[in-house]
């Protein structure tokens, strides 16, 4: 079995430690000792997990155009859409809470919206990582593109580790069992 795990984020050092780049951070945790290579539309790494081939990508097309990279890698690797997992930030979830779903709407997230447009479906698995919504009205962009607070940074590694385990359970156990284990 082959999987594509796509962590959403924006390329470059300006965005590296922002809330919006949590997808990149989780994919980095999965790759821990594996180097990413610059390939078409994405940084790519590959690992084996319990007999499964897992292709990790960090689209380099910027968040709002992530669909182009994801579509390319699904087609290139001949991977079915149910073996795709998109990891993204979510302001509607409290900080650190994760929610795994087999499908759903973009919920106003422009990266997910673009993926839906490129794939022409909402029926793909996604893991949403809560970044909270502690911002004044009209300041959403500043918040999601902002750095983590010191309080968040203190517990972020633990939260990323839980998200990483959810991804591995998705790959090995399937989406239903992974949802039962990780959604609360």
Where in the sequence are the language-model features?
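Hydrophobic alpha-helical segments within soluble ligand-binding/sensing domains
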Residues: 108-111
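Nucleotide and nucleotide-moiety/phosphate-recognizing core
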Residues: 1-103, 113-127, 134-139, 146, ...
């Amino acid at each position: 079995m082959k999987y594509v795990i796509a962590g959403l984020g924006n390329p470059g050092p300006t965005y590296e430690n922002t809330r919006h780049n949590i997808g990149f951070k989780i994919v980095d945790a999965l790759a821990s000792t594996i180097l990413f290579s610059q390939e078409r539309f994405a940084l790519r790494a590959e690992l084996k997990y319990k007999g499964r081939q897992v292709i990790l990508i960090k689209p380099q097309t910027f968040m709002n155009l992530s669909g182009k990279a994801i579509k390319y890698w699904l087609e290139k690797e001949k991977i079915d859409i149910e073996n795709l997992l998109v990891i993204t930030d979510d302001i509607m979830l409290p900080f650190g809470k994760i929610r795994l779903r087999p499908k759903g709407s973009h919920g106003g997230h422009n990266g997910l919206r673009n993926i839906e447009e490129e794939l022409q479906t909402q029926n793909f698995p996604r893991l949403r990582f809560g970044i909270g919504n502690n911002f004044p009205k009209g300041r959403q962009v500043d918040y999601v593109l902002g750095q983590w607070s010191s309080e968040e940074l203190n517990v972020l590694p633990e939260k990323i580790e839980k998200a990483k385990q959810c991804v591995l359970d998705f790959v090995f156990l399937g989406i239903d069992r992974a949802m039962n284990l990780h959604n609360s």
